[in-house]
Amino acid sequence: MTMARRSRLILGLLLLPGAAVAQAPRITPAGDPSVQSDSIYRLAVDPRDHPDESAVFLLDDGVIVVEADGRESRTFRQVVQVLKQSAVEGLAEHSFSWSPDNERFTLNWIRVVRPDGSVVSAGPAQQQESDVPAAMGAPVYANRKVLRVSLGGVVVGAIVDFSTTTVKTRAWVPGDFYQWWGVSTGLSVQRSRLIVDAPATESLRIKERNLNFPRQTTRAGDRQVLTWATGGLTQVKPEAYSADSNDVH
């Protein structure tokens, strides 16, 4: 299961042909050089301080690198602490999908650890890759793959840490790029980070909603790197009869 986000940030970009070198951290199955896992695990909370939550995000992270011709790399990492039994099943079962025609998917890692960093499970107990079948009601076939993963050792108090990278080898519409990101997830978030690395010559069309922290922009050579980073976010509780366009959700 990938924990759902609620959108607060939308990015849109139309790029022109060109090439550049990425400046974002290079994340591989060997790890993320910009994040120390032990420091993230130490952010584990006391469940008694979160009586209304079944889980909390210790880290919600995205690193996106786009090129002028529409190629892109998207790496997402989630580190989630289990607080209640009701969250165990969802965090023990995960599925990831991609289009093999123009995408390459990598499960960088998926593991279960304790708050002290000791490993409970270093990888999937079971995993299966298959085609996505066409729906019986409206049988429209799409060439997509799905990877289903089952984890062992997911119990209350454990931490599930996984990272995926999807590389778009060619764009259906050259130069098109769109991404949304939600800082608010519906759960408490200890650390949230989004990095977008794009050609410096391109004008990013950015729409931000209800952010109480500034983004950081740096330039290195012919690249621009935009970072949204914050932390200590408490759960946003829904309000009965509230409007769906209240700039919070």
Predicted feature descriptions by range:
Residues Q23-H249:
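Beta-strand-rich, non-transmembrane domain signature
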Residues L13-A22:
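Hydrophobic h-region of N-terminal signal peptides that target proteins for export
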